[in-house]
């Protein structure tokens, strides 16, 4: 496949311009997995194709459900054709159950506490400072978004979470939490962008944390071995296969 100019490169993907249509771009997934703001990093052969297909399946569901996203198509494994947009340097996290970093920040909250509606949190993308939590006032002061746009992001994020939560529930899996990102299009609209794959959420089959299918398995490893990475790859393949039914 022919790509245009490289526009950006991150820990797990490379963005290329479309060679003919400047309103589009190609998002190419790497075989990398990382944690701890990149402090831990490994390669898993084939992960890029697995993650790319998972994300394409999720975005296809969102598009069909009326959520505006950057996704156009997935022309080959690990590659998504997307609408170009300027990414907001924000991670938007929706939580149904308290776990992970939330419980570390709020030790008074028991793990498994249910949030209804889902709790929405914002984190400023800054690896050097470990993606600090940011609130409405800080988002507006930094000029990242207006108060009205933050409200829209909260509503749209909740909509995306509840749609995916229901879809996973129909397959016997609890969607515990979800991280998404938004981009600003040429006309100023905010759309769901980046990736939504097995690095983006926590999935507990039957609501059982011990059966987790997601990236938390990698974060929890005391020692990274080739066997552990292959077991993790099998979980990612399982999630990809389940999401095929999202289309």
Swiss-Prot record:
Involved pathway(s): Purine metabolism; IMP biosynthesis via de novo pathway; 5-amino-1-(5-phospho-D-ribosyl)imidazole-4-carboxamide from 5-amino-1-(5-phospho-D-ribosyl)imidazole-4-carboxylate: step 1/2
Family matches, as PANTHER family: MULTIFUNCTIONAL PROTEIN ADE2, SI:DKEY-6E2.2
Gene Ontology process terms (BP): 'de novo' IMP biosynthetic process
EC number: 6.3.2.6
Protein name stated in the entry: Phosphoribosylaminoimidazole-succinocarboxamide synthase
Sorted UniProt keywords: ATP-binding, Ligase, Nucleotide-binding, Purine biosynthesis
Family: Belongs to the SAICAR synthetase family.
Gene3D superfamilies (UniProt xref): ATP-grasp fold, B domain, Phosphorylase Kinase, domain 1
A single GO molecular function term of this UniProt record: phosphoribosylaminoimidazolesuccinocarboxamide synthase activity
SUPFAM superfamilies: SAICAR synthase-like
The protein's enzyme class: ligase
Reaction equation(s) it catalyzes: 5-amino-1-(5-phospho-D-ribosyl)imidazole-4-carboxylate + L-aspartate + ATP = (2S)-2-[5-amino-1-(5-phospho-beta-D-ribosyl)imidazole-4-carboxamido]succinate + ADP + phosphate + 2 H(+)
């Amino acid at each position: 496949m022919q790509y245009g100019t490289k526009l950006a490169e991150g820990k797990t993907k490379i963005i290329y311009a479309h060679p003919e249509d400047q309103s589009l771009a190609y998002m190419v997934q790497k075989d990398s997995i990382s944690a701890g703001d990149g402090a831990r990093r490994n390669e898993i052969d084939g992960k890029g194709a697995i993650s790319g297909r998972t994300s394409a399946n999720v975005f296809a569901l969102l598009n069909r459900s009326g959520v505006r996203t950057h996704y156009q198509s997935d022309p080959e494994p690990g590659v998504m054709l997307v609408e170009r947009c300027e990414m907001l340097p924000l991670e938007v996290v929706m939580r149904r159950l308290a776990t992970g970093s939330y419980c570390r920040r709020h030790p008074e909250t028991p793990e498994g506490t249910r949030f209804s509606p889902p709790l929405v949190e914002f984190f400023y993308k800054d690896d050097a400072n470990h993606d600090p939590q940011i609130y409405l006032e800080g988002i507006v002061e930094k000029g990242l978004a207006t108060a009205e746009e933050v409200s829209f992001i909260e509503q749209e994020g909740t909509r995306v979470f509840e749609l995916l939560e229901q879809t996973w529930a129909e397959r016997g899996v609890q969607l515990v939490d979800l991280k998404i990102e938004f981009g600003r299009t040429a006309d100023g609209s905010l759309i769901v962008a980046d990736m939504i794959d097995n690095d983006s959420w926590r999935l507990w089959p039957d609501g059982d944390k011990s059966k987790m299918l997601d990236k938390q398995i990698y974060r929890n490893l005391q020692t990274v071995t080739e066997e552990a990475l292959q077991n993790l790859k099998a979980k990612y393949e399982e999630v990809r296969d389940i999401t095929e039914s999202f289309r």
